[in-house]
Amino acid sequence: MVYPLKLKYFAKTALWGGQTLKNEWNKPCEYDKLAETWELTLRPDAVNTVLNGELAGKRLDEVIGNEKFPLLIKFIDAEDRLSVQVHPDDRFAAEVENDVGKTEMWYIADARDGAEIIYGIKDGVTELSCDARIEEQVKRVSVKKGDSFFIPSGMLHAIGKGCLIAEIQQNSDLTYRV
């Protein structure tokens, strides 16, 4: 039995979340600010449920029988800028967190005029100085609808105000805020 599965998403709220996913992308939820929808997830605290066909009502782990699914796919609605952050690589995550690392790919599904992301550190910065502000050392990149970015583990990054992003990432929720 092979057919396209429609999955129930997980809604996540945060102070920086917005209204676009709710109002323009028809993603209803109980939160005032909808920050993320996890469209494909097989995490211990979030497993999608099938909404259609013969498998309707079954959890995704029951359907594919794999609790270590490699990907997490989400939409992110940033009404405000997220904190500067970094994710661990697989080795560090396994040793310290007993999890996998987190590498991401962002597709800019929509962006307001002037939207930007933080994407690494400025050229010439070899070491983040504790004496200097992080904001002065990071690279800001203007974004527009249709842009895409690879965010390897270990790279400083942040989603800016006014960005709506489709994110494909390793199945990890490890984030270290800077």
Language-model features, listed with the residues they occupy:
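Double-stranded beta-helix
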Residues: 118-137, 163-178
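Conserved metal-binding segment of the jelly-roll/cupin
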Residues: 143-161, 170
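Aromatic side chains
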Residues: 107, 149-150, 176
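Gly/lys/ser-thr-rich phosphate-binding loops in alpha/beta enzymes
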Residues: 72, 138-141, 145-147
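Transition-metal
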Residues: 1-124
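Fold-independent oxyanion-binding glycine-rich loops
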Residues: 87-88, 111, 152-154, 168
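Conserved protein kinase catalytic core
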Residues: 93, 158, 173
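Structural beta-strand/beta-sheet cores of well-ordered domains, especially the beta-sheet scaffolds
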Residues: 36, 82, 104, 147, ...
